[in-house]
């Protein structure tokens, strides 16, 4: 049936698998995407939204490197918001509500347009391994398929078990079976496996809700978009979300089900996401709070289905219904399906290299929830990098490892490989020590040249980026050289209670004042004429403004990153013998032997490795 050998086989077609397959195919590799249901490619199993704090930056980075998540989100969005705009630009995070069904359909059509990508529906339950190297996969039907590299992106399907109250049943998500055999195969090869848990809220009928009792949550007045490319445009029409609250009455009803909660009764052993707790966990942990927010999100343009964000639960369905019907606006609620929790296997990511290749089996890569992460965006980022590195290894090219000062993707992977995770990992801006460098507005400046060099970014896309960079640079130069008078500027400064100018100065200097923005000066003819003449987009104006206004902070962070990169450049041999350095602490030695860091910088971030241990290594490596 399969007589030829593929370059790359991707197992699983969720957000990680879709990006992995697309990246490999765009690099010209003969790729096969295997999934249990071809109708559910890139399914939004949980909330119908992409982006958010730190996650939006990741989506922009994926897009900058030629991935598709940003484009698909733009094409299927029903609402867009730029979060945290009251804070500095390092915190600005794009987020979009998506049409769930259209999102999956758009992904499938995008993948089907790639000529070197094949598809097959089936369950992979075994790997073909020869001399510690993967050479293919075997399906549950006994079909063997050969490949030079394999990327596993199994999501929540590995031995998945779903829980609603004291009922439990096998499955990877609602209506789909679990995947069996692969965990056992990997454990037999020496991998360590663990269990994690996640959950999802009920879906309800919009026609049964009273939105007049809720608080509308509209999108931005002037929505932006995720993709840097010209193939998508900002939304012209948007759909509202809504906000309401639980109450003490709701909490009391939920408490009546605690004796049948699989979480509280010890039936669920997997660790759940700390930053996305179930509603029962919230009212148990925060008993002093008399209400919690609930966001009611439409699942698409033309569906009655609504997602009840903030009400994830695995309590019995009758308790879910009784409690939710006491929420303002939900008095006559009709359920489409109850919420549930799901437990699944994962593999601690310290078993991987920074390329996402496993340390035990060559040419085998893991990406997504199999590595202990949570979130579509985190999964997609890993899929992109695994797909890229799988192809680079086949071609005997240098691997692509993004550093912590280059991308949130670099922070994500470094955290996983260096620190591991014992609970579902999600990205936050606080995890990135160089977040002023890793802004959403400059993701293309940071990563598009890299994508072009490795083959995931097209020539057309790269040339468009070059032209944009030139326009931004020219505008920055213009602002730096443009003189303004007190008569032009003081009326603007007065609005912000900023001290008036006494003599003429450069616009650049005025723009660095707090509260003052570039849009304030667009009323000046010499600024507005330049913008109109060069047809500058809002994004280009923002890039220029941020570069000028925060130049000092950006320069300081670059200097700090340069210092770290000196340690990053000191490589540690792959088979380095830590036992011969007697000065290392016992814990430090054990952690170094387990993680096997590739640089001194990575070694310094391992929990349990002390500054004294690093000093010893610095001296030893300097010999």
What does each of the following model-derived ranges do?
Residues 307-373, 401-414, 537-591, 596:
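A glycine-rich dinucleotide-binding beta-alpha-beta segment and adjacent secondary-structure elements
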Residues 2-16:
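Beta1/beta-strand and adjacent pyrophosphate-binding region of the FAD-binding site
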Residues 128-144:
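Conserved beta-strand-loop-beta-strand element in the redox core of flavoprotein oxidoreductases
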Residues 431, 437, 448-615, 619-623:
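Extended, charge-enriched "interface" segments that sit outside catalytic cores
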Residues 11, 144-155:
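Short hydrophobic core segments
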Residues 37, 55, 183-321, 329, ...:
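An anion/pyrophosphate-binding glycine-rich loop and adjacent beta-alpha core
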Residues 4-6, 140-149:
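Core beta-strand elements of the Rossmann-like FAD/NAD(P) dinucleotide-binding domain
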Residues 22-126, 141, 153-173, 177-183, ...:
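Conserved N-terminal/central alpha/beta ligand/cofactor-binding core
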């Amino acid at each position: 049936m399969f007589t030829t050998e593929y370059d790359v086989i991707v197992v699983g077609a969720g957000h990680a698998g879709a990006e992995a397959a697309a990246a490999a195919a765009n690099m010209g590799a003969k790729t096969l995407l295997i999934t249990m249901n071809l109708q559910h490619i890139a399914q939004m199993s949980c909330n119908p939204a992409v982006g958010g704090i730190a996650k939006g930056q990741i989506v922009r980075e994926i897009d900058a490197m030629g991935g598709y998540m940003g484009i698909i989100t733009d094409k299927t969005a029903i609402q867009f918001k730029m979060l945290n705009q009251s804070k500095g630009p390092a915190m600005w995070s794009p987020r979009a509500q998506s049409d769930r069904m259209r999102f999956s359909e758009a992904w499938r059509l995008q993948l089907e347009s790639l000529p070197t990508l094949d598809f097959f529906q089936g369950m992979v339950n075994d790997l073909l391994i020869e001399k510690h190297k993967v050479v293919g996969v075997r399906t549950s039907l006994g079909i063997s398929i050969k490949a030079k590299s394999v990327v596993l992106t199994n999501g929540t399907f590995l031995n998945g078990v779903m829980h609603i109250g004291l009922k439990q049943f096998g499955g990877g998500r609602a209506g789909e079976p679990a995947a069996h055999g692969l965990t056992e195969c990997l454990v037999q090869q020496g991998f360590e496996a663990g269990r994690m848990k996640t959950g999802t809220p009920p879906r309800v009928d919009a026609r049964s809700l009273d939105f007049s009792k809720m608080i509308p949550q509209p999108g931005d007045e002037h929505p932006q978009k995720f993709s840097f490319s010209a193939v998508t445009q900002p939304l012209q029409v948007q759909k509202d979300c809504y906000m309401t609250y639980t109450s003490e009455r709701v909490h009391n009803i939920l408490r009546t089900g605690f004796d049948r909660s699989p979480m509280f009764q010890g039936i669920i052993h997997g660790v759940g996401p700390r930053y996305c707790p179930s509603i029962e966990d919230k009212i148990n942990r925060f008993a002093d709070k008399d209400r919690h927010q609930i966001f009611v999100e439409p699942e698409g343009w033309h569906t009655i289905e609504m997602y009840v964000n903030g009400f994830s639960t695995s309590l019995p369905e009758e308790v879910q219904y009784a409690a939710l019907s006491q929420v303002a606006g939900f008095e006559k609620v009709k359920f489409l399906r109850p919420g549930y929790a799901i437990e699944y296997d994962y593999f601690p990511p310290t078993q991987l290299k920074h390329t996402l290749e496993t340390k035990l089996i060559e040419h085998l890569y893991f990406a997504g929830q199999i590595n202990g992460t949570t979130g579509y965006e985190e999964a997609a980022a890993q899929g992109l990098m695994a797909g890229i590195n799988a192809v680079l290894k086949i071609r005997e090219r240098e691997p692509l490892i993004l550093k912590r000062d280059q991308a949130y993707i670099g922070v994500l992977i470094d955290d996983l490989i260096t620190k591991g995770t014992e609970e579902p990992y999600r990205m936050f801006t606080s995890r990135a020590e160089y977040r002023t460098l890793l802004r959403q507005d400059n993701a293309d400046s940071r990563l598009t040249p890299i994508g072009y060099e490795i083959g995931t970014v097209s020539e057309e896309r790269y040339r468009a980026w070059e032209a944009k960079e030139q326009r931004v640079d020219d505008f920055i130069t213009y602002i730096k050289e443009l003189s303004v008078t007190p008569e032009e500027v003081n009326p603007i400064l007065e609005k912000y209670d900023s001290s008036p100018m006494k003599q003429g100065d450069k616009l650049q200097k005025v723009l660095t004042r707090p509260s003052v923005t570039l849009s304030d000066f667009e009323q000046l003819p010499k600024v507005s004429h330049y913008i109109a003449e060069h047809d500058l987009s809002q994004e280009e104006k923002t890039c220029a403004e941020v570069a000028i206004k925060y130049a000092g902070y950006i320069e300081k962070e670059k200097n700090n990153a340069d210092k770290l990169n000196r340690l990053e450049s000191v490589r540690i041999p792959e088979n380095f013998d830590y036992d011969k350095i007697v000065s290392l602490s016992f814990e430090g030695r054990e952690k170094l032997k387990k993680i096997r860091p590739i640089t001194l910088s990575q070694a310094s971030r391992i929990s349990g490795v002390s500054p004294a241990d690093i000093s010893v290594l610095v001296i030893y490596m300097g010999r």
